[in-house]
């Protein structure tokens, strides 16, 4: 198991009931500022969509159907399943100030606002137009997305993880630990202390005699 996977397991936080998901990851500083533990916010009603029926993933090319950027196409850079949100890179943006203090007005930066899954549609790679999709199975038994207009398969994109690694295209290098080496048992439990193990490995013999120790 890689270090990034271990860090991901360790970063899981226990969320309170009726937790309101947002753009910030759970447990981050911005999320704690918006969801303090002493405030109970109203639960948000979200349309239930199973993981099997969800069809939008990071890296997909979509077209926006509503809003000021309607008709524009872009790539999905973030998916928030708990709210059925998708974020399209560089589109549906608003500007906000960060780092504002009493003596400094802050820096204005663009920030993408999320869109509901019904406000975007996948782009058919054949004619570059928005299309409805449906899930089908290939002859090999693989479940794929198929355009209802052209019948073309829309494959899932290869999108990097938070650490920048694309698992499908990753090739182990000379400094990477293989799975076999990581799972190999090399540690032998022993009751000796570290000093005693070092002395045994270097052939050092202890000539001193231990004094009796009494515990009260």
Swiss-Prot record:
Residues with PTM Phosphoserine: 24
KOW domain mapped to chain residues: 56-89
One GO biological process term: translation
SMART domains (alphabetical): KOW
Gene Ontology CC entries for this record: mitochondrial inner membrane; mitochondrial large ribosomal subunit; mitochondrion
GO molecular function list: RNA binding; structural constituent of ribosome
Subunit structure: Component of the mitochondrial large ribosomal subunit (mt-LSU). Mature mammalian 55S mitochondrial ribosomes consist of a small (28S) and a large (39S) subunit. The 28S small subunit contains a 12S ribosomal RNA (12S mt-rRNA) and 30 different proteins. The 39S large subunit contains a 16S rRNA (16S mt-rRNA), a copy of mitochondrial valine transfer RNA (mt-tRNA(Val)), which plays an integral structural role, and 52 different proteins.
Keyword tags: Mitochondrion, Phosphoprotein, Ribonucleoprotein, Ribosomal protein, Transit peptide
Name this polypeptide is given: Large ribosomal subunit protein uL24m
Transit peptide range per the UniProt entry: 1-9
InterPro entries hit by this protein: KOW, Rib_uL2_dom2, Ribosomal_uL24, Ribosomal_uL24_CS, Ribosomal_uL24_KOW, Translation_prot_SH3-like_sf
Organism (species): Homo sapiens (Human)
Family per record: Belongs to the universal ribosomal protein uL24 family.
Localization (cell): Mitochondrion
Pfam annotation, one family: ribosomal_L24
CDD domains listed in its UniProt record: KOW_RPL26
